A protein has these predicted regions:
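Long, acidic, intrinsically disordered low-complexity segments
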Residues: 1-26, 80, 166-189, 314, ...
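Well-ordered alpha-helical scaffold segments within catalytic/enzyme domains
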Residues: 7-21, 66-79, 138-153, 231-251, ...
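Extended, well-ordered alpha-helical scaffold segments
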Residues: 28, 32, 79-95, 152-172, ...
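Active-site-adjacent bridging/hinge elements
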Residues: 36-46, 110-118, 203-215, 336, ...
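Aromatic-rich carbohydrate-recognition surfaces in CAZymes
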Residues: 57-85, 89-191, 409-425
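Extended ligand-binding clefts on enzyme/binding-domain cores
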Residues: 61, 97-101, 108, 120, ...
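C-terminal capping/lid segments that line or modulate ligand- or cofactor-binding pockets
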Residues: 118-124, 129-132, 296-316, 354-426
Length: 426
């Protein structure tokens, strides 16, 4: 059993009571919330937890964290659910040690995935080996939040310590990608699915930040320093320091020292290279930079994103540079901002033209203090579910019945998180 049905049912009833003015929200919330627990979570023989992303038979390190994060509220009172989340952290750390460059994994060593098309150092556990900085941030975030929200510490075992060392080592190596063993080439006509320069990636200069091959959308980076992911790395490196200092885990002294150094160098890189100006001359964060003077003004609808910087804990919502960046992102100056008959928001090179992502709409709501904006976005999300009663990867701004991904648990859970935020359940 992954959770106590009685405890979760009682909690859902409490949420429904607080949201009784919004029955449409409640209907979608309950469907999304229970679907993830009932249909994506599997407890394995070793007691760890595998979380299916949805309609793709694999687990993403990023998605699985976001899928279970909204359950931390209930995990405070449900020991079964608490162990399910701890089991996910254990599984994530085990898989990171199988290959820290992989973004998604199989439930067993079955060689399923992109093995016939991808030229990179694969093994049977890997579904896909697109290296994304945030894939290593998310498990650290979940381990920390589970501890702080519920007091659970069983996730901090020997595997966690070893995996944390591996993450710190990899991020240090990738501060100068010339020292990296990672290469990725896919047999494809879609340029976003492969790396240039025989799999090495685009040209860059050393900045102090850590290099990324792909974005959270699983599309390749145009420039190799992805600012939102480096922001996220700064945040979780702070978590690492708190975990190892307060719990006095094995090798605490060296891990704390390494994480402090890395955090300071990445933050300095952000301060020295991450800023650009928008069309109004305002100082904003670039989405990607290469250290050679090139920068992109855009955002990705996934998380981490520039829009999500306060949600990730990197900056305050009222930070001036963030607010200028936010206005720029949510405007036509962002080439992936689309406005239509039913909605406006962020799209992606990963999906069709004029398709926007519910995840980004949820993040827009989670990064404003304006209750009216939150309500507007929740109403919009429910109205644009394509008549399915759940969220999708993306939908057309002029016709929400046109959408991608029939079953996308991450989007479902981001909607749930925004509902809880609106109701002040944090």
């Amino acid at each position: 059993m992954t959770y106590s049905k009685e405890i979760v049912r009682e909690w859902l009833d409490q949420v429904a009571e607080r949201a009784k003015e919004y029955p449409e929200w409640v209907d979608v919330f309950e469907r999304c919330y229970t679907d993830t627990l009932d249909n994506t979570v599997e407890i394995l023989e070793d007691g760890s937890t595998f979380v299916l992303t949805g309609d793709i038979p694999a687990m993403w390190l990023r998605d699985s964290t976001a899928q279970l994060r909204p359950y931390l509220h209930v995990a405070k009172r449900d020991p079964q659910l608490r162990q399910t989340i701890a089991g996910l952290v254990k599984r994530q750390m085990t898989l990171i040690l199988k290959d820290p460059y992989a973004n998604s994994f199989n439930i067993e060593e079955n060689w399923k995935g992109h093995h016939e098309t991808d030229h990179t150092d694969l093994n049977g556990w890997i579904w896909e080996r697109k290296y994304e900085v945030d894939s290593l941030c998310y498990p650290l975030q979940l381990a920390y939040l589970l501890w702080k929200e519920t007091g659970e510490t069983s996730q901090f075992d020997e595997t966690f310590v070893t995996a944390t060392k591996e993450i710190l080592h990899l991020w240090t190596v990738e501060q100068d990608h010339k020292n990296s063993p990672y290469r990725f080439v896919r047999d494809t006509d879609r340029k976003e699915d492969t790396l240039v320069n025989d799999g090495f990636g685009p040209d860059f200069a050393v900045t102090g930040m850590t290099w990324s091959a792909f974005r959270p959308s699983d599309d390749c980076c145009q420039y190799s320093y992805l600012i939102p992911s480096n922001m996220f790395a700064v945040v979780v490196l702070g978590y690492v320091q708190k975990i190892f200092a307060e719990l006095n885990l094995a090798d605490s002294e060296s891990i704390i020292a390494d994480s402090k150094r890395l955090q300071a160098e990445i933050q300095e890189g952000i301060e020295n290279y991450a800023y650009t100006t928008n069309s109004k001359g305002e100082k904003i964060y670039a989405f990607e930079v290469d250290g050679l003077g090139n920068a992109s003004i855009m955002d990705d609808p996934n998380v981490p994103s520039l829009l999500a910087a306060p949600y990730l804990g990197y900056c305050a919502i009222d930070d001036e540079v963030y607010q200028a960046t936010r206005r720029t992102i949510l405007s036509p100056e962002n080439p992936y901002f689309y406005e239509g008959k039913y909605a406006s928001g962020l799209g992606s090179s990963h999906t069709f033209y004029r398709y926007i992502w519910p995840i980004a709409l949820s993040i827009q709501g989670l990064t404003t203090t304006d209750k009216a904006e939150k309500k507007f976005l929740l109403d919009q999300l429910v109205a644009c579910d394509g008549g399915t009663g759940v969220m999708h990867e993306s939908f057309h701004v002029d016709d929400p019945t046109k959408y991608s991904r029939e079953w996308f648990s991450w989007a479902n859970m981001m909607f749930c998180e925004l509902v809880l935020d609106y109701l002040d359940i944090r």
